[in-house]
Swiss-Prot record:
Belongs to the G-protein coupled receptor 1 family. This is Proto-oncogene Mas. GO terms for molecular function: angiotensin receptor activity; G protein-coupled peptide receptor activity; peptide binding. It comes from the Eukaryota. The keyword Zinc-finger does not apply. Residues 61-64, 128-148, 206-223, 284-324 are cytoplasmic. It is a multi-pass membrane protein. Residues 1-35, 87-103, 172-184, 245-262 are extracellular. Acts specifically as a functional antagonist of AGTR1 (angiotensin-2 type 1 receptor), although it up-regulates AGTR1 receptor levels. Positive regulation of AGTR1 levels occurs through activation of the G-proteins GNA11 and GNAQ, and stimulation of the protein kinase C signaling cascade. The antagonist effect on AGTR1 function is probably due to AGTR1 being physically altered by MAS1. Receptor for angiotensin 1-7. It comes from Mus musculus (Mouse). The keyword DNA damage does not apply. Glycans are attached at N5, N16, N21.
Length: 324
């Protein structure tokens, strides 16, 4: 794999730099409008997710769902931070020195790390809510207390492993034939994991969830929570999923798909920035929108009527991980 493809932004910057050096006196090429939009949206999304993370960590009691949302916000924050710095770097058009080059690579890898984690977490959210509807007794009485935290830790570890494989085999590889074959193997593995495991799980569990909710009137009590889940997944599939497809194609067909890189980054930025807006508008009361405290709005959006319960020694049941 040609090392000039270590990051798509680095590739574009190198091409722009060489083009200017070849034509003396040429003016600085205009920054694509897409990068201006990214540099406008990503700080807003970063602040939104930061505020959301602060409320989830310090102002609200946790339930199984908010544990996942907390980790999803961390993944979105890391993604938005990296994409903002990459866009600023592209706009300033620094020379690609060795140290600067690897800084860009580090940011790009962290960006992929946040993206992969977001996909895995959304799948876990969808699957767990589906299980809570299919097996309500297990969910309320027998679900392990720290299952959400344990699943999140496993998914972060899986994301780290997948991202490291992608970096070592595809981004930081040389031009040797064995490196190219190793990269193809990693691409196939990631494609199977993303499009034949996690995405189908997300779609199937979401479909089952919608069907079960429509058939059960009791689900209306926590309908806002299900709306949050469904809208978040739909936004992810529309805006974020194309980026993974393009990134896998870049490694082999950069010349054909490289021009779509900026659009895929913009879509991914929109996805990560949209989540806090989804939580706010779904949790807001139509009659009191913009007049309620953020804590009240988030509590309503994340309220879980099917709170897990735990058996005590005296035979009584008590609720755990309730939301204020």
């Amino acid at each position: 794999m040609d090392q000039s493809n270590m990051t798509s932004l680095a590739e574009e910057k190198a091409m722009n730099t060489s083009s200017r050096n070849a034509s003396l006196g040429s003016s600085h090429p205009p920054i694509p409008i897409v990068h201006w939009v990214i540099m406008s949206i990503s700080p807003l999304g970063f602040v939104e997710n930061g505020i959301l993370l602060w409320f989830l960590c310090f102002r609200m009691r946790r339930n199984p769902f908010t544990v996942y949302i907390t980790h999803l916000s961390i993944a979105d924050i890391s993604l938005l931070f990296c994409i903002f710095i990459l866009s600023i770097d592209y706009a300033l058009d620094y020379e690609l020195s060795s140290g600067h080059h690897y800084t860009i690579v580090t940011l790009s890898v962290t960006f992929l790390f946040g993206y992969n984690t977001g996909l895995y977490l959304l799948t876990a959210i969808s699957v767990e809510r589906c299980l809570s509807v299919l097996y309500p007794i297990w969910y309320r009485c027998h679900r392990p207390k720290h299952q959400s935290a344990f699943v999140c830790a496993l998914l972060w570890a899986l994301s780290c492993l997948v991202t490291t494989m992608e970096y070592v085999m595809c981004i930081d590889s040389g031009e040797e034939s064995h490196s190219r074959s190793d990269c193809r193997a990693v691409i196939i593995f990631i494609a199977i994991l993303s499009f034949l495991v996690f995405t189908p799980l997300m779609l199937v569990s979401s479909t089952i969830l919608v069907v079960k909710i429509r058939k059960n009137t009791w689900a209306s009590h926590s309908s806002k929570l299900y709306i949050v889940i469904m809208v978040t997944i739909i936004i992810f599939l529309i805006f974020a999923m194309p980026m993974r497809v393009l990134y896998l194609l870049y490694y082999e067909y950069w010349s054909a798909f490289g021009n779509l890189h900026n659009i895929s980054l913009l879509f991914s930025t929109i996805n990560s920035s949209a989540n806090p807006f989804i939580y706010f508008f779904v949790g807001s009361s139509k009659k009191k929108r913009f007049r309620e405290s953020l804590k009240v709005v988030l509590t309503r959006a994340f309220k879980d009527e099917m709170q897990p319960r735990r058996q005590e020694g005296n035979g009584n049941t008590v609720s755990i991980e309730t939301v204020v």
